[in-house]
């Protein structure tokens, strides 16, 4: 069965476009029916980020869940990993994060977590999709069995304590000046507070959400403001989170960006030296730079690749027993601590390494020289541009031109109508020519559809 609603990271789209109150209500009903197992009172934890449409979707989902007899615990703006953690710790049957992650405020989305705090599998999402296409009127709860909803206090402190416990008890961030950019998103309260409690000198930006400014010229997808602030304040490090704080990008004291691949390299090397890697390797996606793979090989570590999407990284980690994985975009999964990507906890692991080594971030966090990597996006309205003969021919020609001295990846986005064309290799000019040829072919195919 084709997937009409779920992408690689839940359901995501334009608020009041794809993501309507009607859809949110139906998702609440469908997921609520599917996760009511056993005779106990069933409940769901719902969190959100700071975008304006969060109110609309939150209340619609409350109506959906309570209409099928589930109690709802509302935690308000909280990081996605915090919602996953709370779902498990509060013994809920289900967790929901209302967020479109790094997208601007016009979009929103629905991420679902099972009772152990893990994102739902493809099979479970397909079951929910089947229910979305059915009439559920006859499956609603009786009047006396409707669910209740209430807001929960103290959840911020729970997450702060959880994050702090991922560091050694005797480790302090005293002496570190940290600029943190919370993207005017879900982490705007908890992360600055946690850093302060750990002893850092904290300078916060992106902590004034108004419903419209989430991810707007700030956060991990737009770290330029953070780079400037780090240099201006002569800070030791900058931390950029995205709107729901499940991804992170760092900035060194010189204002240079440290992406997810470099973070994986730092943590992998540190954990190997401390004997903390459960297996001699890590898991990343097909988008991770070949430079990371070569660095890990030099450390005696393997890089296992998966399709794009942190859920696929985690699935491979769990299946094969790895405890470190992530994406170039900054989703870092530390399965010893969390069930999903946690940008803040990942940043703390790097800060711990910096404190242990007592060296500048620029020396600690740039582990390898990345190969030239070029990524271009082509939007399309309809059809399947990748299935055309012209595009297939362009890809085949590009592979032959790289001739084993680089990589080529052409794929459809799982969250928006975009074809992503990525090439990397030792010869930047050749890579750029190959990528441009494929982009032209995809653009022509999209225009003809």
Curated annotation (Swiss-Prot):
Binds 1 Mg(2+) ion per subunit. InterPro entries: A-D-PHexomutase_a/b/a-I, A-D-PHexomutase_a/b/a-I/II/III, A-D-PHexomutase_a/b/a-II, A-D-PHexomutase_a/b/a-III, A-D-PHexomutase_C, A-D-PHexomutase_C_sf, Alpha-D-phosphohexomutase_SF, GlmM_bact. Keywords: Isomerase, Magnesium, Metal-binding, Phosphoprotein. One of its GO terms (biological process) is carbohydrate metabolic process. The modification Phosphoserine is found at residue 101. It catalyses: alpha-D-glucosamine 1-phosphate = D-glucosamine 6-phosphate. It is an enzyme of class 5 (isomerase). One of its GO terms (cellular component) is cytosol. Signal peptide: none annotated. The active site is at residue 101. One of its GO terms (molecular function) is magnesium ion binding. Activated by phosphorylation. It holds the Pfam family PGM_PMM_III. Its EC number is 5.4.2.10. Its cofactor is Mg(2+). Mg(2+) binds at residues 101, 242, 244, 246. Belongs to the phosphohexose mutase family. Catalyzes the conversion of glucosamine-6-phosphate to glucosamine-1-phosphate. This is Phosphoglucosamine mutase. The lineage of its organism: Bacteria, Pseudomonadati, Pseudomonadota, Alphaproteobacteria, Hyphomicrobiales.
């Amino acid at each position: 069965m084709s997937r009409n609603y779920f992408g690689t990271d839940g359901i995501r789209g334009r608020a009041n476009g794809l993501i309507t109150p009607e859809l949110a209500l139906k998702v609440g009903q469908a997921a609520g029916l599917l996760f009511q197992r056993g005779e106990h009172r069933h409940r769901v934890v719902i969190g959100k980020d700071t975008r304006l449409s969060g109110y609309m979707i939150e209340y619609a989902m409350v109506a959906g869940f309570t209409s099928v007899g589930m109690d709802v615990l509302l935690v308000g703006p909280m990081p996605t990993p915090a919602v996953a953690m709370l779902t498990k710790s509060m013994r809920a049957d289900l967790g929901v994060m209302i967020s479109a992650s790094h997208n601007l405020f016009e979009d929103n989305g629905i991420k679902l977590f099972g009772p152990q705090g893990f994102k739902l599998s493809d099979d479970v999402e397909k079951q929910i999709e089947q229910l979305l296409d059915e009439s559920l009127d006859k499956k609603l709860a009786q009047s006396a069995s409707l669910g209740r909803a209430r807001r929960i206090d103290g959840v911020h402190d729970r997450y702060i304590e959880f994050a702090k416990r991922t560091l050694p008890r005797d480790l302090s961030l005293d002496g570190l000046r940290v600029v943190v950019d919370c993207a005017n998103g879900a982490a705007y309260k908890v992360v600055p507070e946690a850093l302060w409690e750990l002893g850092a000198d904290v300078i916060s930006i992106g902590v004034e959400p108004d419903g419209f400014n989430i991810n707007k010229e700030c956060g991990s997808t737009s770290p330029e403001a953070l780079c400037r602030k780090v240099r201006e304040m002569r800070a030791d490090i900058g931390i950029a989170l995205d709107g729901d704080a499940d991804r992170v990008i760092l900035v060194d004291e010189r204002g240079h960006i440290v992406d997810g691949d470099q973070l994986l390299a730092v943590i992998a090397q540190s954990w190997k030296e401390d004997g903390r890697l459960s297996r001699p390797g890590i898991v990343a996606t097909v988008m991770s730079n070949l430079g990371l793979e070569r660095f890990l090989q030099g450390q005696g570590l393997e890089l296992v690749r998966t399709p794009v999407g942190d859920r696929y990284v985690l699935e491979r980690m769990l299946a094969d027993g790895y405890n470190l994985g992530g994406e170039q975009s900054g989703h870092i999964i530390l399965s010893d601590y969390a069930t999903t990507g946690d940008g803040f906890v990942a940043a703390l692991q790097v800060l711990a390494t910096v404190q242990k080594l007592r060296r500048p971030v620029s020396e600690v966090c740039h582990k390898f020289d990345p190969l030239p990597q070029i990524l271009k996006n082509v939007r399309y309205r309809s059809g399947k541009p990748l299935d055309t003969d012209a595009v297939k021919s362009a890809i085949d020609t590009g592979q032959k031109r790289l001739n084993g001295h680089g990589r080529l990846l052409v794929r459809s986005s799982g969250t928006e109508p975009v074809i992503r064309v990525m090439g990397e290799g030792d010869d930047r000019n050749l890579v750029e020519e190959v990528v441009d040829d494929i982009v032209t072919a995809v653009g022509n195919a999209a225009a003809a559809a």
